Amino acid sequence: MATQRASGLLQRLAQGSLVKQILVGLVLGILLAWISKPAAEAVGLLGTLFVGALKAVAPVLVLMLVMASIANHQHGQKTNIRPILFLYLLGTFSAALAAVVFSFAFPSTLHLSSSAQDIVPPSGIVEVLRGLLMSMVSNPIDALLNANYIGILVWAVGLGFALRHGNETTKNLVNDMSNAVTFMVKLVIRFAPIGIFGLVSSTLATTGFSTLWGYAHLLVVLIGCMLLVALVVNPLLVFWKIRRNPYPLVFACLRESGVYAFFTRSSAANIPVNMALCEKLNLDRDTYSVSIPLGATINMAGAAITITVLTLAAVHTLGVPVDLPTALLLSVVASLCACGASGVAGGSLLLIPLACNMFGIPNDIAMQVVAVGFIIGVLQDSCETALNSSTDVLFTAAACQAEDERLANNALRS
């Protein structure tokens, strides 16, 4: 009986809500740091192990996901997807730009176990570009060992295009390997509550409860930027497309897609909800049946915001100077990173080291930033997914309605 009860408890823990478990880990970590500082410092090992597991799996994850995605790409998508695809990419880049502006206006400070003396910052945009180019020609094994994400991306894209000409058995093998790595990532992330318990306990024990205010400020910047994009930037893009008041459509998408996505925390899981909303809005089925799954893959405004804000928070904490051209380049890199963040729990967080590489921030410190992202992830990930998923429907509806009006006007003229 005792064994059955224990196995039942483990099953509930494994299949339970990760959000609730992370909340419990946060609360327990705060309580332990308040009750016993030595005990809180001791359980910091749990957080160290969690961050180490993330560092181990992240480079392989990026390589396999990108390679499998390109190798298994299907040709022959309809040409009327192009306006929606353009909106997706423009929206993601606009979100990254907004995040840069927010981060400079309201700089956040993180508590990292390193000082600016450990960092050799680039002197300007030329050195940043030189570093990026040199990273691109890195040996693939060396790139994986040293977490050189630029080099990993280049090899993943190159191998992906090469494997397009391979037979189906090879493509299936690559896809299966990608699924296996994704499973390992999900397994690691199931330990997030325990890791966060250790991280919060040790952080509060060593730095004090003032750290919570630093995370609160970071959350306000992140969520404030996402609200700016959802309520100002996206409506402007929709108005540019449909030339009328965009807010009825914006609020409908936030209400009927964003709310669901906030709680599911998965763009993929929200695809049926978005499909039903598109049908309710009388959109073209041939269009939204392609654009909604496509949006769940590449339309990642929330991820671009997360990557940009957390990267610039690390840069500000370490005292690394950032000029305007470098900030603009970060917006481009964050947009590209965001497009690769789909389908993985915590995907946007695991791509932060790629953006941090631009500023000479080592992988060890970048993964501490990822750990901070997991601590605030209860709200950050929910808001990010709500923005991402609701924008899928919003831009699809805007493009479809603009096309319908164009056809109607042409019919009237003729």
From Swiss-Prot:
Output the GO biological process annotations, alphabetical, semicolon-separated: serine transport; threonine transport
What this protein is reported to do is described as: Involved in the import of serine and threonine into the cell, with the concomitant import of sodium (symport system).
Family note: Belongs to the dicarboxylate/amino acid:cation symporter (DAACS) (TC 2.A.23) family.
Query: What cellular component terms from Gene Ontology apply here?
Result: plasma membrane
Q: Give any Pfam family that matches.
A: SDF
Membrane-topology descriptor: Multi-pass membrane protein
Protein species of origin:
Salmonella agona (strain SL483)
The residue range of the signal peptide is none
Has UniProt tagged this entry with the keyword Cell membrane?
yes
Q: Where are the transmembrane segments?
A: 16-36, 46-66, 84-104, 143-163, 180-200, 219-239, 300-320, 332-352
Its recorded reaction(s) are:
L-serine(in) + Na(+)(in) = L-serine(out) + Na(+)(out); L-threonine(in) + Na(+)(in) = L-threonine(out) + Na(+)(out)
Instruction: Give its localization.
Output: Cell inner membrane
Q: Write the gene name.
A: sstT
Q: Which domain of life is it from?
A: Bacteria
Alphabetically list the UniProt keywords. Amino-acid transport, Cell inner membrane, Cell membrane, Membrane, Symport, Transmembrane, Transmembrane helix, Transport
Supply the name of the protein: Serine/threonine transporter SstT
The family database entries (HAMAP family) matched by this protein are listed as:
Ser_Thr_transp_SstT
The answer to whether keyword Cell inner membrane applies is yes
GO MF term set: neutral L-amino acid:sodium symporter activity
